Structure formats: structure tokens, C-alpha cells
């Protein structure tokens, strides 16, 4: 029989339920091991989430998945096409993109200041006495192959070198973004017996 009060559990006995945040990665689990850039981005996000007491659920864009109902938001890491972004919108969760400029599509994003980073690195090389500087760059596409993503470092490199009077289009080597590709590009350049630049960036 009710006697007019409710018994409450002691606060110390209550276990706080962690909020869940999903990470969707554009690289596959295997490719991430060869891509230290995206690997470190993910680790940084997971570390901060842990500090804020969030539980992280990882998904890979190349594997079909069903998002857990408990997820309160989604962090999308990588380069995604407009079509892929539309698919993510159907998840019905708040979206934040990392390394994609999605402001024009109405989603908050975090991007790298490549212009400043490239200028700082190139200025350092020039201060070390490098008079000719080559660029190792790559061409990326979204995982659905719908959009080509230009390397923002290339424009920053070109602008810096033109301003300094050291631009040479023949010193731009284009492959893909992997250590193996970089190795093969440099090896092929050496084998041409052409004069090499003082440094490659």
C-alpha cells in the first residue's frame, strides 16, 4: 500500500549510461593502416571522446551498416561526394565532417589549413638553402568515384614557388596518397637521370 513517498536508489549505485557517437570513415580498415593522416585523426577524435565520456562506434563506408539507434551524432572522416552526404542525412542524426568542406551543404566541418602549413614548410626549406623544391602530390576521388578531389597543397605550393621565382611544373610528381606511391615516384624521377631538386615536399 502506498504511504506517500517514493524510494530512490542511492546516487552512488546508479551507473551513468554513456552517450554513443558514431565515426564513419571513408578509408577501409585495411587502408587506414597505410594512411597515417586519417589514422591520427581518428585516434585524436577517439581520445577526446573518451575524455568527455562518450562511447565511440566505428563504421567503414565500404561496408554496409545499420546505425545503432542510441547514437546521438555522427562524425564523418574523409572526403565524401554530395550523393554520399545525402545518404548520411537519411540517418536522421546530427552530422559533423572532418577533412571535407561541407558548410555549403549545411553541415559543420573541421578542415586543415593547408595554405599556412605548406607555406611554413616551404619557407623552412628555403631558409635551409633549398633553391629548387619539388612536390609529391596525389589525386583522390570520393569512394563512390563520383568526384575528383584536388590536392589543396598543390595550389599553395604553386603560389609560394611563383612568388619566390622558383616554380617549375616538371618538379610536381603526381601519384596517389600512399608511402609506396611516393617511393615509386621518386625512384622513377631518379632513374630519368635528370637533375633533382634540392628537396621534395
Regions found by a protein language model. Give the residues of each.
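Short, electropositive alpha-helical surface patch
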Residues: 70-78, 151-158
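Extended catalytic core of nucleotide-activated donor transferases of GT-like folds
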Residues: 62, 73-92
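Bacterial carbohydrate/catabolite-sensing allosteric modules
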Residues: 7-9, 26-27, 39-56, 89-97, ...
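Short loop/edge segments at beta-strand edges and connector loops
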Residues: 58-60, 78, 174
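Short acidic/histidine-rich motifs immediately flanking catalytic phosphotransfer sites
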Residues: 67-74, 194-198
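Short secondary-structure boundary/capping segments
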Residues: 13, 65-66, 86-88, 192
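Amphipathic helical "hinge" segments at domain boundaries
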Residues: 5-66, 70-72
Amino acid at each position: 500500500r502506498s504511504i506517500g513517498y517514493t524510494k530512490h536508489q542511492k546516487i552512488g549505485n546508479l551507473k551513468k549510461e554513456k552517450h554513443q557517437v558514431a565515426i564513419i570513415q571513408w578509408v577501409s580498415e585495411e587502408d587506414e593502416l597505410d594512411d597515417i593522416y586519417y589514422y591520427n585523426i581518428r585516434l585524436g577524435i577517439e581520445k577526446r571522446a573518451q575524455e568527455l565520456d562518450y562511447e565511440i562506434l566505428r563504421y567503414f563506408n565500404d561496408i554496409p551498416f545499420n546505425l545503432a539507434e542510441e547514437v546521438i551524432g555522427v562524425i564523418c572522416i574523409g572526403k565524401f561526394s554530395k550523393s554520399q552526404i545525402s545518404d548520411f542525412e537519411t540517418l536522421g542524426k546530427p552530422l559533423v565532417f572532418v577533412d571535407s568542406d561541407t558548410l555549403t551543404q549545411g553541415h559543420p566541418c573541421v578542415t586543415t589549413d593547408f595554405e599556412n602549413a605548406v607555406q611554413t614548410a616551404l619557407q623552412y626549406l628555403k631558409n635551409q638553402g633549398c633553391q629548387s623544391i619539388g612536390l609529391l602530390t596525389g589525386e583522390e576521388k570520393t569512394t563512390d568515384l563520383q568526384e575528383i578531389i584536388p590536392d589543396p597543397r598543390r595550389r599553395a605550393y604553386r603560389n609560394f614557388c611563383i612568388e619566390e621565382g622558383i616554380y617549375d611544373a616538371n618538379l610536381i610528381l603526381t601519384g596517389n596518397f600512399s608511402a609506396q606511391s611516393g617511393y615509386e615516384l621518386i625512384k622513377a624521377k631518379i632513374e630519368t637521370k635528370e637533375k633533382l631538386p634540392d628537396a621534395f615536399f
